[in-house]
Curated annotation (Swiss-Prot):
E.C. number: 2.8.1.6
Cofactor note (record): Binds 1 [4Fe-4S] cluster. The cluster is coordinated with 3 cysteines and an exchangeable S-adenosyl-L-methionine.
Gene that encodes it: bioB
Protein name in the entry: Biotin synthase
Pathway: Cofactor biosynthesis; biotin biosynthesis; biotin from 7,8-diaminononanoate: step 2/2
SMART domains, per database record: BATS, Elp3
Natural source organism: Prochlorococcus marinus (strain MIT 9312)
Length: 335
């Protein structure tokens, strides 16, 4: 372990290197769980943020992400639809709130945000969700500084833009957008005063070194992303990665635990692929540092545990729903 536990509890770092992270990621599991749980207890209460995700516009994306069924390059048989009307989205947000969610995430299958009627509707949706007393998150691809500013003015809590994988493995997953494009988008979001939601996916054919490299980029962002979604690949027929094998749940536990050690105060979100995890594996993820989940029976194009099953699980675990999200003040972003 590159740092003693006492040192881990004293400081939050932004200078982790890949070798240190690999050493943590490869620790004996029982030691890794102990270290991550100790950090988690120090910096976070045992409560879980419930984020509900809704696909506002599905399919037809111009990017060639090899894991995604919404890409125009995918042969997946998904049900595409144009952008929902504001009223329809607000109805879904109200359902999510009534079920206990405190964040409503809205997804658009776009390469980038484009000005016009659709963007104006997005701004209206953001304002409407905030008026419900919920946090509002958007994921819609790249954006300009002006668009980020307008989203901030509308009250957007967070913008999601994942890195997906390591800089080294990235070219094997997507070629229509560069890694630097993603980092530039994150910088614009941060500089507009919007919280950053940024994570990645495991199970894309990457090595353990790639996972460490992804975590190196995330943990050296200053400040750290407020939310860090950790996804496991859901291999969908018709996508470029349809034949990839499911990851072992221990790999997800290791990724969650390492992310918690590196980014002590971030919301570590147990995201896509959670339905494949056993109840026991999910509990270990919560113990090791996961303190946010996607809540509701559907993500963008994949299934998820139901509201009812998640409430039952959280009650068994003994954690509370999270209502105390900390909004960071506007601060310039550095990489």
């Amino acid at each position: 372990m590159p740092n003693s536990n006492n040192q881990l509890l004293k400081e939050i770092r932004f200078d982790w290197n890949k070798e240190e992270i690999l050493e943590i990621l490869d620790m004996p599991l029982i030691d890794l769980m102990w270290e991550s749980q100790t950090v988690h207890r120090k910096f976070n209460k045992y409560n879980i943020q419930l984020a509900s995700l809704f696909s506002v516009k599905t399919g037809g994306c111009e990017e060639n992400c090899s894991y995604c069924s919404q890409s125009i390059y995918s042969a997946s048989e998904i049900k595409s639809h144009p952008q929902f009307q504001v009223e329809e989205v607000m109805a879904r947000a109200k359902i999510a709130k009534n079920e206990g969610a405190d964040r409503f995430c809205m997804g658009w299958a776009w390469r980038e945000i484009r000005d016009g009627k659709s963007f104006n509707a997005m701004l209206e949706m953001v304002s409407g969700v905030r008026d419900l007393g919920m946090e509002a998150c958007v994921t819609a691809g790249m954006l300009t500084e002006e668009q980020a500013s307008r989203l901030a003015d509308a009250g957007l809590t967070a913008y999601n833009h994942n890195l997906d994988t390591s800089p080294e493995h990235y070219k094997n997953i997507i070629t229509t957008r560069t890694y630097q494009d993603r980092l530039d988008t994150i910088k614009r979001v941060r500089n507009a005063g919007i919280n950053v939601c940024c994570g990645g996916i495991i199970g894309l054919g990457e090595t353990n070194g790639d996972r460490a490299s992804l975590l190196e980029v995330l943990s050296n962002m200053n400040p750290h992303p407020e939310s860090v979604p950790i996804n496991s690949l859901v291999a969908i027929e018709g996508t470029g990665l349809e034949d990839n094998q499911e990851i072992d749940s221990i790999e997800m536990i290791r990724m969650i635990a390492t992310a918690r050690i590196l980014m002590p105060k971030s919301k570590i979100r147990l995201s896509a692929g959670r339905e494949k995890l056993s109840k026991e594996a999910q509990i270990l993820c919560f113990q090791c540092g996961a303190n946010s989940i996607f809540y509701g029976d559907e993500l963008l194009t994949t299934s998820n545990p139901s509201f009812q099953s998640d409430r039952k699980l959280l009650k068994e675990v003994g954690v509370s729903f999270n209502k105390d999200f900390e909004t960071r003040e506007k601060t310039l972003f550095s990489l």
